[in-house]
């Protein structure tokens, strides 16, 4: 019991400190791109003392790692914007799990408008029997547990995208286990649609897209993929950088929810808020394995960075201390990661060397030296006697290997 309360005190301290840090390091945004049209002010890289040689090295790295598009915003203005491998500024691309962070904002907006309360049971909105849990177990699952990845629904040896009740059965009490389980997240769409009485795309279009000039939509299949062009992704990042405000208008005005969203949400994974990844924490977990890594999620990145991360390197990095947004879309950069954390760390190595005073000696074909530090099965046990194994490396990379016998 004492350990539990000490965890709660730690979270309260981290939340208070992070709120103060985020608010004091965020700049007063003086520039926002127009809601309509293609006009968007730029800032010369030379104003940031970035050298063209180092920029070229970064772009080569991006191209060699299957990047489709890349944007860096500073003070809301475009410093770098590159389209590669057949992509263009009008091409729509999927966000993958980076859309989880978008959904967190939408849930917050629905709560702000009184449609739902994240302390409510999920069953309040989508009815009973949405899982194979007992009635009491199901009632104990709240919307906030879906946001925190702590529903306790089984994530071992199942289709993580299956939202049928037969796929969703009890493993642990909510808040006792952090697990990156896609199905409870996918059901947030049903929660929002039931609560608001609107389709998810209609609600997003009214409350977000038309307010900040975004263009994007969720697909109709059960994977819930969100599609947009790259600048729309950057606009969303700019909105969150400015704490839910856009050019004087409050898009998400609930500051309590906003700060809960971008800070540690539970004691199990310090580096996870409400569907947002948080840098600079003492430890972190990654998808699909019950293992806690020491240190921050991205050691090369600023400690105040928050990120929306998706499969195959879909990335939105938000850095309040630098008033900067970094967006990457593309195909798999070959990091063998369920999310983009390892690739994101590599990316930051190049970003950190953009200044003319830096010497960029990286080869675009080089790989970080790494060693295996642990081999576990899907349950998190140290073993090599399993058909499915997860190899954990010193740089945070995780490889899933299927052993054929």
What is each model feature region?
Residues 113-151, 198-229:
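Active-site helix/loop module of the DD-peptidase/beta-lactamase fold
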Residues 1-30, 361-364:
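Bacterial Sec-dependent N-terminal signal peptides
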Residues 172, 211-320, 333-338:
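Penicillin-binding protein/beta-lactamase superfamily catalytic region
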Residues 76, 93-119, 146, 188-192, ...:
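Active-site SXXK
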Residues 58-87, 316-317, 323-327:
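A short, well-structured edge-of-sheet supersecondary motif
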Residues 388-405:
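C-terminal tail/sorting-segment detector
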Residues 89, 152-228:
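Catalytic-site signature segments of enzymes, centered on catalytic residues
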Residues 29-42, 355-381:
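Residue-level detector of functionally pivotal "anchor" positions at catalytic/ligand-binding pockets or at interdomain
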């Amino acid at each position: 019991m004492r350990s539990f309360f000490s965890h709660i005190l730690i979270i309260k301290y981290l939340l208070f400190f992070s709120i103060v840090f985020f608010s004091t390091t965020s700049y007063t945004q003086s520039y926002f791109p127009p809601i309509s049209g293609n006009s968007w002010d730029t800032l010369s890289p030379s104003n940031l003392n970035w050298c063209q040689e180092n920029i070229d090295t970064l772009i080569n790295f991006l191209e060699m790692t299957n990047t489709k598009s890349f944007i860096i915003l500073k003070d809301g203005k475009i410093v770098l914007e590159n389209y590669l491998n057949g992509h263009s500024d009008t091409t729509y691309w999927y966000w993958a799990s980076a859309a989880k962070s978008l959904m967190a904002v939408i849930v917050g907006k629905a709560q702000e408008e009184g449609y739902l309360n994240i302390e409510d049971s999920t069953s309040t909105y989508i009815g009973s029997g949405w899982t194979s849990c007992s009635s009491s177990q199901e009632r104990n699952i709240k919307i906030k547990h879906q946001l925190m990845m702590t529903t306790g629904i089984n994530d071992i040896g199942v289709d993580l995208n299956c939202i049928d009740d037969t796929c969703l059965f009890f493993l642990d009490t909510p808040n006792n286990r952090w697990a990156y389980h896609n199905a409870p997240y996918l059901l947030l769409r049903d929660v929002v649609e039931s609560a608001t009485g609107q389709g998810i795309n209609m609600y997003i279009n009214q409350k977000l897209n038309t307010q900040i000039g975004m263009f994007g939509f969720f697909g109709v299949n059960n994977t819930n993929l969100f599609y947009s062009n790259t600048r729309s992704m950057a606009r969303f990042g700019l909105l969150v950088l400015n704490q839910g405000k856009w050019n004087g208008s409050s898009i998400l005005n609930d500051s309590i929810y906003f700060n809960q969203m971008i800070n540690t949400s539970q004691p199990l994974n310090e580096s996870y808020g409400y569907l947002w990844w948080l840098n600079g924490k003492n430890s972190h977990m990654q998808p699909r394995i019950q293992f806690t890594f020491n240190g921050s999620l991205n050691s090369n990145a600023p400690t105040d960075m928050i990120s929306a991360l998706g499969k195959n390197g879909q990335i939105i990095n938000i850095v309040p201390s630098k008033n900067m947004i970094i967006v990457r879309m593309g195909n798999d950069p070959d990091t063998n990661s369920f999310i983009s954390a390892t690739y994101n760390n590599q990316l930051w190595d190049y970003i950190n060397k953009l200044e003319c005073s830096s010497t960029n000696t990286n080869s675009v074909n080089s790989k970080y030296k790494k060693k295996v530090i642990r081999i576990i099965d899907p349950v998190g046990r140290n073993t090599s006697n399993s058909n499915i194994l997860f190899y954990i490396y010193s740089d945070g990379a995780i490889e899933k290997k299927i052993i054929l016998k």
